[in-house]
Amino acid sequence: MNLMAGSFAHMANLLFPRGCAGCDKPDDVLCDACLASFDCELSQPLETAEMGRWFACGWYRGAARQSILAWKDHGDEECDRPFSDALCRLAERAGVIDAMDGVREICDTILVVPASSSIASMRQRGRRHMMPLAKRLSAFLRCRTGFRVQVCDALTNKGIKGKSVETKGTEQRAQRLKGHVMVRPGVTLQNKAVILVDDIVT
């Protein structure tokens, strides 16, 4: 099956050649140079978080920004895998696995929650673009720790106008979301630890 899938992928690339999502270098989903822009370990204090900080794979600029836009708003689903891998590497470097051991005694499940998009954005994209990344991270953490880790589509957006990429800086993005993001009816987060995953840190 893998050989057949590889053959089809090779044929598709011959018929419809692609370029790197970040710089358009031929025959790469993300070339090594652009992929390196997601191999950072950025963090800032976040007092309400269990670890006391948020973490990011890279700065939203240059090739990283271009590739995120190609993936998020122009349907480049082949970026799911390299972005997922970058997220898993970040989780390991940032100490998420060690932090999970710290909450083992106080919660029975860790939920990986993808940040929600507006209904209009999801209709335009035809999918929940963060879900493949959340599933990959959940499987990675479950394999590494043996802990019960699940993906939970816990959040919903209502009444948000415009796109996050059209705002400038975290303050504008935070104002755009304020009062519009809520937990879905019927979802309980009691006795659960939550890892929130987003494409752009807000």
Segments (PLM) and residue ranges:
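Glycine-rich phosphate/pyrophosphate-handling loop used in enzymes and phosphotransfer proteins
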Residues: M1-T202
